[in-house]
Design a protein with these regions (language model features):
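Conserved acyl-donor/pantetheine-binding loop and adjacent beta-alpha core of acyl/acetyltransferases
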Residues: 19-66
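Conserved active-site alpha-helix within GNAT-family acetyltransferase domains
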Residues: 106-130
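Conserved GNAT acetyl-CoA-binding A-motif
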Residues: 61, 90-111
């Protein structure tokens, strides 16, 4: 599997391919200002509480907004490989100890938010807040 970067956005969009076949992607938002991210999360998540995230170095970090696998490729083991490649990419661009924030949230009925959080925890993410309807906020 390979990835390509879309330079036409402020976010980093990784596209994953198996040969010429598009498998899915990842959306990574650089965190220039931690307070801006906290405001953004507060606006989009009803019961978000940013106090715990304030303990982490957010400025200069990254917000992993989404990793997705195209519907026809789900269940073929691509997600784990895409997550590993995404984390390798993030680790290359963040070397100053800044944090990576994500939301373990699934719209796929075959994988729960808790299962996603379990997978992310294998990569060093810790749970900060389990929201009612908007997934689990995690940080590394």
């Amino acid at each position: 599997m390979t990835n390509e970067i879309d330079d036409n956005t402020n976010d980093v969009i990784l596209g994953f391919f198996d040969g010429d076949e598009y498998i899915g992607g990842a959306d990574i938002e650089p965190i220039r200002y931690g307070e801006k991210l906290l405001d953004e999360l507060n606006d989009s998540i009803d019961d978000f509480d940013g106090r715990a995230l304030r303990r982490y170095k957010l400025d200069g970090g990254a917000y992993l907004q989404d990793i997705w696998v195209e519907r026809k490729h789900r269940g073929n083991g691509y997600f784990s490989e895409m997550l590993k490649m995404t984390m390798d990419f993030i680790n290359e661009i963040i070397s100053d100890g800044s944090s990576v924030v994500l939301r373990a949230y699934s719209e796929n009925s075959n994988i729960t938010d808790d299962k996603l959080a379990e997978i992310y925890s294998r990569y060093g993410f810790v749970e900060i807040q389990d929201t009612d309807d908007d997934g689990i906020i995690m940080v590394k």
